[in-house]
Amino acid sequence: MFKSGFVTIVGRPNVGKSTLLNAIMKEKLSIVSCRPQTTRNNIQTILTEDNYQLVFVDTPGIHKPKHKLGEYMVKSASEAMKDVDLVLFLINPDEKPGRGDLFIIEQLKEVKVPVFLVLNKIDENPQEKVAETLKTYSELMEFEEIIPISALKGKNIDLLKELMFKYIPEGPQYYPEDMIIDQNERFIVAEIVREKALRLLSEEVPHGIAVEILQMKKNEKGTYHIEGNILCEKNSHKPIIIGKGGSKLKKISQYARQDIEAFLQSKVYIRLWVKVKEEWRDNQSLLKELGYKNMK
């Protein structure tokens, strides 16, 4: 008997959805940053084992949109809960249910498939706090399963996989067993660069950056030559991203190159520039060019 199913992970921004996905896959597939709303595009990630295949749709955190990109992110996350076989609602025990959580719960009540409540960061919170949070959420809605985990340390991840297998239906293998992600290499490379930029930049340059891959070529020796732009919205952001004497941009390139080489399993030469594109997050045509799907 072979089972297969589509799973979506939902939760407030910065709750650890990307970290959980990476822990399940044991791969660095989804951008991880300490800043909320860093996952911007639905990434279908595929986990194939001997007797099942799980297709994960990694979604942005649900939040009140402030621009076209924000509207897309919220719509994307909401639509991801439709036409799936299982929903994982990820929360942190150290935070009481806020407006965002209550908004998600109202949406989850309309879902016709099993919903798991997954408590992240249990290693960082006392058992009493975890138990209190469990009680609070259990009173808000009924969940098929409640699983405490530590995505960062991998605690109870195998248990979570076992329970997901239990609930998904019998079905075909949708993707080849060696395929782990349905996005192209350029998209992944851009996300890696963006993650490094978010980690290294100060709060003066929050989410108003994107990465545009201009060129990605592989020579006869197997080395990738990559060129790209880091897009920002304000002229004042440009020198911050570049840094004194180009130091910040150099660090972004160095750190990104290491992860890109691990991803492509090849030597990489990368060159980045910083370009100002005012209000790019409200530019629908540019958002489409940058890979944000279903923009209308």
UniProtKB/Swiss-Prot annotation:
GO terms for molecular function: GTP binding; GTPase activity; ribosomal small subunit binding; rRNA binding; small ribosomal subunit rRNA binding. It is a peripheral membrane protein. GTP binds at residues 11-18, 58-62, 120-123. Residues 3-170 form the Era-type G domain. Residues 149-151 are annotated as: G5. HAMAP family: GTPase_Era. This is GTPase Era.
